[in-house]
Design a protein with these regions (language model features):
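Peripheral, non-AAA+ core regions of ATP-driven protein-machinery
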Residues: 1-121
Length: 122
């Protein structure tokens, strides 16, 4: 059963941290991965990094179309620190994990699925 998966991360807005709400939706259409919400280049690259990490960790993402929205839409999101929040939102949308809406997730994923400390960039 699919629905909307939700998690949270953090980005810098000027000199203050701002909570990023991560929403994931899985559609019954051709495979793909759309990332919305003013992501920078490193975050755009997370689509391939997250798919590879999930597959190599033995927990592949859905083969359907995944849309991820990062809110608030008007705030630029920087860096790979949102990887973990995105993959957990995708798993929640697919019904594979529960209770991930409360915590803030802040980590980069390696291609092997390992978690890496990821600093928030100004």
């Amino acid at each position: 059963m699919s629905g909307i998966g939700r998690t949270r991360s953090i980005t810098l807005a000027g000199l203050r941290g701002e909570v990023v709400h991560v929403e994931a939706d899985i559609a019954q259409s051709l495979p793909g991965f759309t990332l919305l919400g003013l992501p920078d280049q490193a975050l755009q690259e997370s689509r391939d990094r997250i798919r590879s990490a999930a597959r190599n960790a033995g927990l592949p993402l859905t083969r359907r179309h995944l849309t991820v929205n990062l809110l608030p839409a008007g705030v630029h999101k920087r860096g790979a620190c949102h990887d973990l929040a995105i993959v957990l939102a995708a798993y929640a949308a697919d019904g594979r994990v529960r209770n991930v809406e409360g915590p803030v997730f802040l980590a980069e994923l390696g291609l092997d699925g390992a978690l890496h400390l990821s600093l928030i960039h100004i």
